[in-house]
A protein has these predicted regions:
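Accessory RNA-recognition modules of RNA-modification enzymes
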Residues: 1-299
Length: 299
């Protein structure tokens, strides 16, 4: 297999190199690394590839924490530590500003960092019955594939949600409509977890009983979505706390529905708002008008 030296990262976290006059985009490779690569798609001007052996590693390379990394398509940069990821994304942003808008910022503030693990408060999990895998799979799609990753944990989801993955596989496998439930939307607020089940067929009374028992045992809320997003409604418990998250610096609490937009990382959102208000330095009596996407968020 050919080898090359990585020059940079693209906006999808792939290493970028030049080889035989072509741009090569290599998954799993980092800048300044010398890698052996294998191409899986060839075009006249570029190739898409995966890294094989790392002959000379970047000093910031780390061992991926998740044992599903490399197969699951939910993450692409676990082989680069958190500070390295932030620096790489900043460079991509600076390059985009220049190449698209011919802009070079006069001042760049330090990147805001948050936890690298168990931070993701939203997720769309795919569901599929796969007899060859022993039953129902619940998780993200595999890389470059319509197959669902065979996973029983996720390092970026909250620990309580990650622990639900094997339990959900068993639960859905016991439903009469297990092959008519293609998706679970996960939304996590402060102390509240909602699972929206996309169903293509009505539940039986036995199915409903199983869902109620699971919700009570695991402390989650089930919603059902028989059609488009607007059809999502609470199933059990009917009377339950609303999804929300607090902005304690400003005495605010934002409420949202599970299928409405919020930032995936609530902690980072709080820090962004704190920095924005510090930069604006509003005086007493001044009003600040913000553009709020779908009303629930501020960034």
């Amino acid at each position: 297999m050919p080898e090359t030296i990585i020059e940079s990262l693209d906006n999808e976290g792939r290493g970028v190199a030049r080889h035989d006059g072509k741009a090569i985009f290599i998954e799993g490779a980092l800048p300044q690394e010398r890698v052996v690569f294998s191409s899986y798609r060839r075009k006249p001007n570029y190739e898409l590839a995966t890294a094989g052996r790392i002959l000379a590693a970047n000093a910031l390379r780390v061992e991926p924490r998740c044992r599903h990394f490399g197969i699951c398509g939910g993450c692409s940069m676990q082989h680069l530590g958190g500070p390295g990821q932030a620096a790489a994304k900043q460079r991509v942003l600076e390059d985009d500003l220049w190449h698209i808008g011919r802009m070079r910022p006069e001042v760049i503030f330090p990147a805001i960092h948050g936890p690298s693990w168990a931070y993701r408060t939203r997720a769309r999990l795919s569901v599929r019955r796969v007899p060859k895998k022993g039953g129902v799979l619940v998780g993200f799609h595999e890389k470059r594939s319509s197959f669902i990753a065979d996973m029983d944990s996720c390092e970026v989801l909250p620990l309580s949600v990650s622990a639900l993955l094997p339990l959900l596989r068993s639960l859905i496998g016991a439903l009469s409509i297990s092959d008519r439930l293609p998706q679970i939307e996960v939304a996590v607020g402060d102390g509240v977890t909602v699972l929206v089940l996309r169903i293509l067929q009505r539940l039986t009374p036995e199915d409903e009983s199983l869902l109620r028992d699971f919700a009570e045992a695991q402390g989650v809320q089930f919603w059902l979505q028989p059609g488009g997003p607007e059809t999502a409604q609470p199933f059990h418990p009917i009377e339950a706390p609303t999804l929300s998250y607090a902005l304690p610096d400003f005495g605010l609490r934002l409420e949202f529905r599970p299928n409405e937009f919020t930032q995936v990382n609530h902690g980072i959102n709080r820090m962004l708002l704190r920095r924005a208000m510090h930069l604006l330095q509003p005086e007493t009596g001044e009003r600040i008008v913000t553009e709020i996407h779908k009303r629930e968020d501020v960034f």
